[in-house]
């Protein structure tokens, strides 16, 4: 019937929306998420990424966040929830893309359906779908669409989505390259047109992005953050293969615990395709692209979201494995329905705290939620006044929640950003500290729930000493709810005086506490 081919994709979309929606939108706002939200807030005000906040990843995630902030302004909704809703929509669409990819590669609707249901069970992806903005959530959608259109030989669209994935995370440029390579190696009669369409699709998003930053007078900032910093200053943890493999294992085992067996079977199914004879083109985009994330992961694997790039392969591989097994039975439809129900049950069980509490803590490092963070941010204003000047050197969540502007683009200084500051700010790192002193922040946020790195992590010895020397006489560390801040000692003293005045009016004997504070 007309439109019948859309029924199952729409049902999968609705199912994904239901399952992911069960996680709720109140998950903790992690440091990295707040960087993209802050950039999105500033972009909605007309300030482009890299100018508003320095970052070394692609511009697409803050642009998507900026779109969400603009929508919140249009509808009068909360900007954090609206941005999360936009990223949630990309996650739901990713499930549909996985279905279409599995169906196209293995020419089986059952394989596509089981692949989508398998994908719903990947906890590390599902949890972040509503608690972001996790920048790699839309990456999976773009990756799956790039592979889907390459499988269908729709070169422009494959190149377009591969290019968008590259603008989200630089290593994804491998997918755009695979599209171009496949197009350029088509038979002679197809080659010219295919190559031209692939090149046009790849070029279009890049040219639009470059034009945007050029128009904003920020092309140098874009090129520096997107490309140069990663070669000149970026600092990571262990880079030895053994260390990387240990990190990868620890960040896969628990966050994906309920689906480890399907992941393993799915990956092995994909690997088996390399030896399948006779070989068919429909497998080629998947097989040519698959080594790229493997090679990158051997070089740099940090957290569970670094495994996202493998999820489409694992999902369609496991879906194909189950579909092939079902075809060998007497009643494949009934067994497919049973297996689908089992996979859906796992996906639903993942939403229960009793099942996923360990995985959740591994992903976020805290049990704090967004409402708790909001309360703490408001408490900061209540304690020190709404006119309090705020800055961040490692924890911009407070700036996002209170809609405050940082005095400079450096919301975090780990991972080699201190060397970037030293190279680009007039007067170097010490000049940056002098500029910060001129701004005279009453409080500087530096740590929050779920973080693992202090602002001193990865700093050079000289920069660590300079920061410590500058902070010690002026500020004292103070915990307010889930946040740690360096608060000016003068502000704390003034607060103590106010509290003592109130206490003395109720109990004259309480004046001694002020002397204790002044002596600190």
Feature locations, PLM:
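Hydrophobic/aromatic-rich transmembrane helices and adjacent perimembrane loops
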Residues: 293, 299-334, 338
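Multi-pass, polyprenyl lipid-linked donor-dependent membrane glycosyltransferases
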Residues: 60, 86-90, 114-121, 125-145, ...
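Loop-to-helix entry region of an early transmembrane alpha helix in multi-pass inner-membrane enzymes
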Residues: 59, 63, 74-96
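Short periplasmic/luminal acceptor-recognition loop of GT-C membrane glycosyltransferases, typified by
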Residues: 56, 158, 177, 354-357, ...
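Transmembrane-helix signature of polytopic, membrane-embedded enzymes
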Residues: 4, 98-123, 140-141, 156-157, ...
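Membrane-interface helix-loop-helix junctions at transmembrane boundaries of multi-pass membrane enzymes
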Residues: 2-4, 104-105, 187-198, 265-288, ...
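Membrane-interface transmembrane helices that cradle and orient dolichyl/undecaprenyl
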Residues: 138, 143-158, 184, 259, ...
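Membrane-interface alpha helices of multi-pass inner-membrane proteins
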Residues: 143-149, 155-170, 175-183, 203-204, ...
């Amino acid at each position: 019937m007309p439109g019948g081919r859309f029924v199952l994709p729409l049902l999968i979309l609705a199912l994904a929306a239901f399952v992911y929606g069960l996680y709720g939108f109140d998950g903790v706002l992690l440091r990295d998420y707040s960087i993209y939200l802050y950039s999105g807030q500033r972009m909605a005000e007309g300030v482009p990424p890299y100018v508003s906040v320095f970052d070394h990843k692609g511009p697409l995630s803050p642009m998507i966040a900026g779109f969400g902030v603009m929508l919140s302004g249009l509808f009068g909704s909360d900007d954090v929830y609206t941005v999360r809703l936009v990223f949630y929509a990309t996650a739901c669409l990713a499930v549909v893309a996985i279905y279409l990819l599995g169906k196209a590669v293995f020419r089986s609707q059952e394989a596509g359906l089981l692949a989508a249901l398998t994908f719903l069970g990947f906890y590390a992806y599902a949890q972040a779908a509503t608690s972001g903005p996790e920048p790699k959530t839309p990456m999976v959608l773009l990756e799956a669409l790039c592979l889907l259109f390459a499988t269908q030989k729709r070169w422009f669209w494959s190149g377009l989505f591969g290019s968008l994935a590259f603008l989200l995370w630089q290593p994804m440029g491998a997918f755009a390259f695979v599209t171009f390579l496949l197009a350029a190696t088509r038979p002679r009669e197809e080659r010219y047109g295919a190559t031209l369409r692939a090149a046009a699709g790849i070029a279009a998003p890049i040219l639009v992005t470059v034009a945007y930053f050029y128009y904003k007078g920020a092309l140098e900032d874009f090129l520096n953050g997107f490309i140069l910093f990663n070669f000149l200053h970026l600092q990571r943890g262990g880079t030895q293969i053994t260390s990387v493999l240990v990190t990868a294992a620890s960040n896969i085992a628990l966050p994906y615990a309920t689906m480890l067996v399907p992941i393993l079977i799915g990956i092995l199914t994909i690997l088996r395709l390399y030896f399948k004879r006779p070989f068919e083109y429909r497998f080629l985009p998947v097989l040519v692209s698959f080594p790229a994330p493997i090679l990158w992961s051997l070089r740099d694997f940090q957290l569970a979201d670094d495994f996202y790039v493998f999820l489409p392969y694992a999902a369609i591989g496991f879906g194909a494995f189950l579909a092939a097994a079902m075809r060998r039975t007497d009643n494949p439809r009934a067994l497919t329905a049973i297996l689908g129900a089992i996979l859906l049950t796992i996906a639903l069980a993942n939403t229960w705290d009793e099942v996923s509490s360990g995985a959740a803590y591994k992903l976020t490092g805290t049990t704090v939620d967004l409402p708790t963070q909001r309360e703490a941010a408001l408490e900061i204003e209540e304690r020190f006044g709404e006119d309090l000047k705020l800055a961040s050197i490692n924890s911009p969540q407070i700036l996002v929640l209170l809609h405050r502007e940082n005095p400079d683009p450096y919301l975090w200084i780990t991972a080699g950003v201190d060397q970037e500051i030293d190279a680009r700010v007039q007067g170097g790192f010490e000049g940056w500290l002098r500029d910060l002193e001129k701004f005279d922040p009453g409080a500087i946020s530096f740590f929050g729930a779920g973080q693992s790195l202090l602002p001193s992590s990865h700093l050079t010895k000289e920069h660590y000493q300079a920061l410590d020397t500058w902070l010690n006489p002026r500020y004292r560390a103070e915990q307010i709810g889930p946040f740690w801040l360096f608060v000016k000692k003068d502000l704390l003293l003034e607060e103590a005086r106010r509290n003592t005045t109130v206490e003395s009016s109720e109990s004259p004997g309480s004046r001694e506490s002020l002397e204790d504070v002044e002596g600190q």
